[in-house]
Curated annotation (Swiss-Prot):
Organism: Parafrankia sp. (strain EAN1pec)
Keywords linked to the UniProt accession: ATP-binding, GTP-binding, Nucleotide-binding
PANTHER family linked to this entry: RNASE ADAPTER PROTEIN RAPZ
HAMAP family in alphabetical order: RapZ_like
NCBIfam families given in the database record: PRK05416.1
Name of the protein in question: Nucleotide-binding protein Franean1_2060
Positions of GTP binding: 64-67
Keyword Transmembrane: no
GO terms, molecular function: ATP binding; GTP binding
InterPro entries to which the protein is assigned, alphabetical: P-loop_NTPase, RapZ-like, RapZ-like_N, RapZ_C
Amino acid sequence: MTAATLDLAIITGLSGAGRSTAAKCLEDLGWFVVDNLPPALLSTMAELGHRSGGAVSRIAVVVDVRGRAFFSDLRAAVEALDSRGMHPRMLFLEASDDALVRRFDHVRRPHPLQGDERVVDGINRERTLLAELRGEADLVLDTTDLNVHELRAKIDAAFGQPRANRLNATVISFGYKYGLPLDADLVADCRFLPNPHWVEALRPYTGRDSQVRDYVLAQPGATEFVDQYTALLRLVGEGYVREGKRYLTLAVGCTGGKHRSVAVAEQLGARLAADGVGVRVVHRDLGRE
C-alpha cells in the first residue's frame, strides 16, 4: 500500500461535542477507529496501516489534546506524516456553551477541565486551549442543533466513499422446523405456497433448480408476493439508510428450507441487487434433510 492510498482522519474537538458519536459513525462507514490515541503514536498507527497490505485502508483516531504537550505531539505527528506523503484530515467538533452545559447535566458528569468551578468554566477553558487547533482543522462541525442522525449524515458526506450510503442486505432461506434465524430483521413466510416436496418429480431438487423455481413462481400469489415484498423492502431499506442503518437481514422461510424459501430468497435477492443493494444470499438449511 502506498502512502496515497491510506486515508487518515483525526477526530478532535470540545468535550461533549460528539467525538465518540463521530467515531462510531466512521466505524459504521468502514473506518478502523482508535479511541483516545496519544498523538505521539499517530505515526505508528499510520505505519501499521501502511504495512497491512490493504487490509486497513482507512484509519480514524480520536485524539484528546487538552494538554499542551499533547498539542505539540499532535502537530509534530501531523508534520511527520505530511513529510511522508500521508496527509490526515482533521475533524473538529464543537457546540455552543448552552448545548454543552445541557449535555453534561444530562449525563451528570463534570467537565474534565472545570475543577472546583462550574461546567461552563471548564468549557471556556477548553475552548481557549483548542482555539489554535480549531483554526487548523479541515472540517469544523457545530453539533449544537444536530441530532445523532444529522451528525451521521454530515460525517457520511465528508468521509464516506461513493455508495457508502448503500444498503447491504443478507437474505437467508430457512426451514421453520429448524427454528428462526436469530439475527433476522424481517421474516417472510412462504408456507402459503404449495409445497414441491409433495410433487415426487420435484422432491429431489431444491429451489435453486429451475424445475422447482418455475413451479414455485407459477403458483397463485407467488409473483405478487415477490413483487409486493420487493416494494416493502424498498420502503424499509430507504428508511434504514435515512436512519443510518446499513445492514438488513431478511429471513425467508418454508417448512424445511429446501424448496419454496430457497426459490423466493433467490428472487428477492436478485430484485434487491437490481435496485443497487449489496446482497448476500444464504441458504441456511439446504442439505439438512
